[in-house]
């Protein structure tokens, strides 16, 4: 049974101690999708390993998330929504939205919690999409 999200507090210090490892799926060695999976696991939802996500096109990622992994696209992010970054129609990064910021990990800076605008200011030609997990927000209408 899923934990009550209103009672759950993100332990940011725990994640900020993790280090970026390509393909990392176990704390403290996480890549960006590994971090998303670990956060969801801590709130009671199991996400797929999705090893090859870096090779996904926007269409494939959206189709996979919506159909297979019980996500749906949203335009106004809420806490625990997944934020996905695409460049030239290719998925290259994901993170977790929390309190209008992003929790994410990258190869050159490990894990951090910062305004989304900080990440976008260093990148050109990026498309951002937000996805909500139906397992966590089952009480809302889609």
Segments from the language model and where they lie:
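N-terminal capping segments
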Residues: 1-72, 86, 92, 134-141
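Charged, low-complexity, helix/coiled-coil-prone segments
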Residues: 23-26, 84, 112-118
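Aromatic- and glycine-rich peptidoglycan recognition patches
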Residues: 71-72, 91-142
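Loop/turn positions that initiate beta-strands
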Residues: 79-82
